[in-house]
Amino acid sequence: MKLNVTIEIPKKSNVKYEYDRKTNQISVDRILFGTEVYPHNYGFIKEALDWDGDELDALVIADQSFLPGIIVPAKIIGAMEMIDDGETDTKLISVIDCDPRYKHINNLSDLGEHTLKEIQNFFETYKLLQNKKVVIKGFKDSAWATKEYNECVELMKKYGKMDKDEFVNKMKKEHPEKYKA
């Protein structure tokens, strides 16, 4: 599956930017509390609402680092299921789709085990100094990622104008299985 990902955070940055759907702007949310930096470009899929009330997140693996707000064509190769401080926070995993160096990568196994371990390690540790708990439930294939994307597109259509906290509370009641670690 090929999608456009809007970059929030460049690769190797320790600045946590956040997109605000109401203002349509990206702003600085915080500086990461520790020494961690994002291992890959990090962004979102504008038309898809994840179960945490934010746009569906996506990592874009590329040699380059892209500025916040830039749209990058990406090939989705899988996903990482994650619970962040009690909320579902799925990360689609993709590679840049306009660089011939990445044309051979079609699934997570093409990345290699070490790259996946780096991604998992970053997300397991980047909030430790904030005393927030992150649970990685595991990696999923591209078919699972496509299904999750389609589900999140439907959530955006139905609930995209709803307040974030109201949405999360409603979803926790209606779909408690989505919030279990």
UniProtKB/Swiss-Prot annotation:
Mg(2+) 2 binds at residue 57. GO terms for molecular function: inorganic diphosphate phosphatase activity; magnesium ion binding. It is found in: Cytoplasm. One of its GO terms (cellular component) is cytoplasm. Its cofactor is Mg(2+). Catalyzes the hydrolysis of inorganic pyrophosphate (PPi) forming two phosphate ions. PANTHER family: INORGANIC PYROPHOSPHATASE. This is Inorganic pyrophosphatase. It comes from Malacoplasma penetrans (strain HF-2). The gene is ppa.
